[in-house]
Amino acid sequence: MRTSRSSGAVPPRDAQSKNLKRISTMAGAYGLRNYTVRDIRELKGKRTLVETLAFTPEEAAAAEAAGIDTLKVRFDPKSPELAAEIRQAAPHTFMSFSLPLIAVTSPQEALRLAFSAMEIGGDAIMCQWSPRFIQALAEAGVPAQGHVGLVPRKSTWTGGLRAVGKTSDEAIELYRQIKALEAAGAWAVEIEVIPQQILQELSRRTSLITSSIGAGSGGDIQFLFGEDILGDGPGPFPRHSKQYRNLYALRQQMQAERVAGFREYIADVQSGAFPGPEHVINVDKAIVDEFLEQLDKEPR
């Protein structure tokens, strides 16, 4: 039912024929999505969804056009405009906003920041916060995803940037962390760089949607960063990733072409080749003579 607080046009009723769901965001904006939290939960153990993290609106638009199931997007509270632009670039894709670890110091601040992200159209929140913070989000109805395994910003606790869960003690600790997230009300968990066999067993034993990055198959979602998929960086890339394109080489080629173009321009100016006859405007000699005659009468 439409209310006075909702914004935008009511989504068309034929959305289902396009495999889209009619939704309202937490801020009251109508929209269409490929999935809802409930849809993804119902797919657990039935089909592996495909996820990427988009860094730019162009990446997000390409991901949606390609058929990526879900997106993660970094949300910077100091400049939320980029996240909003990415949301607009992929309006129909289920999108979780990843919130910075050290941006908040209490559950109340965490909830306030989560609401800020949901206000621009987030479908869920991804965070590396403790279960106590996640509980605050869950109690307010915000779908929250936790993070276990190699959590880079907390890697001092696990011995640096390395695989986690290669011993039975570490694997049991992962299980306990996941159960704590369950108890806090999380709906999903990102599991990073753990043994594939451990992921498979963990995913079977939790109601949470498991998003695997560097943890092999067996999770509910397979996740890689967009820049890793597209080879959009100088490398080295993470061992767990695969590069399907080499956009970095294309960017380097474009930069080389920029430099070459500027150098040719400089050379043409210095040699007198530019501007040429086709680049300038001419007038009759009579006009020039008349101008010079008038110019001589002007005060110097």
Specify the residue positions occupied by each region the protein language model found.
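Alpha/beta enzyme core
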Residues: 2-300
